[in-house]
A protein has these predicted regions:
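Short, charged low-complexity intrinsically disordered segments located at boundaries
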Residues: 17-19, 129-134
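N-terminal extension/subdomain marker
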Residues: 1-51
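Catalytic residues for metal-mediated phosphoryl-transfer on nucleic acids/nucleotides
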Residues: 33-125, 132-183
């Protein structure tokens, strides 16, 4: 069994260093630890809320690391809104999926991206998308490919921690995001 007291995570130009007071164990078998696999009881509302917060924080951390690890010279930040004020996440995700398919068909290549849905106070959905290493595409062309509402695209310049910028859009308190993919 191995132990360690420090951990470093490198995500692009960002380095996270963790130092632990007690040793962290690795290379162990889960079967030895889980000897009492029995029925599990329903979590209390307090525990559910704590678990949601942990899950949300873990997702934001993952988004931050993914973006920082994949950012490139031609990366763009894209915001997609709906003219119809869509509030149904399944419908919005379907429309985004169709946009992605049309966009990849237009470009002739698969795009590398990370997408985060965000809800307004009225429950309307819009998307924040980081497009990694994307060639120049005219705004008008992108607008016609989206065709569901307003778009805004910006080149990512002079930003050291783009992942932190993107992860702040992740909505923690929205009930629609419970048990849903957050990025």
């Amino acid at each position: 069994m191995k132990t360690y007291y420090k951990k470093a995570i490198v995500s692009g130009h960002v380095i996270e260093i963790y130092q632990y007071e007690k040793p962290v164990y690795s290379d162990y078998e889960l079967n030895k630890i889980r000897q009492h696999e029995g029925r599990r009881q329903e979590a209390s509302e307090d525990n559910k809320q704590k678990n949601r917060e942990k899950c949300s924080n873990r997702a934001a951390r993952t988004v931050r690391r993914l973006v920082n690890s994949n950012i490139a010279i031609n990366s763009k930040f894209l915001t997609l809104t709906f003219a119809d004020h869509v509030t149904d996440l399944k419908k919005a995700n379907y429309e985004f999926k169709k946009f992605k398919q049309r966009f990849e068909y237009y470009l002739g290549v698969r795009i590398k991206y990370l997408c985060v849905p965000e809800f307004t106070k009225k429950g309307r959905i819009h998307y924040h998308v980081v497009l990694f290493n994307l060639p120049f595409v005219k705004n008008k062309t992108l607008q016609s490919i989206w065709s569901n509402g307003f778009i805004k695209i910006n080149k990512i310049d002079n930003c050291d921690n783009v992942g932190a910028y993107v992860s702040k859009y992740m909505t923690k308190d929205n009930e629609q995001m419970i048990e849903e993919k957050s990025y």
